[in-house]
Amino acid sequence: MIHFVKNIPIDENVPENYKEIVFGAGCFWGVERKFWDLPGVFLTSVGYSGGDIENPSYEDVCYRDTNHAEVVKVTYDSNVINLMDLLKIFWECHDPTQGMRQGNDIGTQYRSVIYTNNDDDLKVALKSKDIYQKELVKNNFKTDSLESITTEIEPVKNYYLAEEYHQQYLAKNPNGYCGIGGTGCSFPKL
């Protein structure tokens, strides 16, 4: 499988000093588009993560109770772009207070998630959540409670590559559906 935007194999061997992070923020088509062209991002792919069965299909994730989220795996050079920069894009591209949905896309597969590969990245992700929660409160974002961000943040449990037609979908289909939308609150400069 070839990455439609980067023109390299999606299963390309990751350079040793590169890092990976997994984001879920609604339909993976729009989320992937936010990351694939960023300087320092080596590769993106969409898949399913956090669920209870191995090698799920799109139909399994949508129509069965697999507990997977639609996600984007971002492989990046941390010497060019740091994790906090990626997290800024993640927080701003969707509404992390909506629980098991993003806009009109409803279901557990559309939940907000961050899955990390190590404890240091987990700490940074948790810190970024606290920063963004304070920003939502500061901007009087309409939420149910002061602890309104519902994003699941934990070590990556599994990652299964989605079908080829989902990979870089919005590059192949520029007028395709994208239901993600942010809160309008910017992640503060640190």
Indicate residue ranges for each PLM-predicted region.
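Flexible coil/turn and secondary-structure edge motifs
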Residues: 1-190
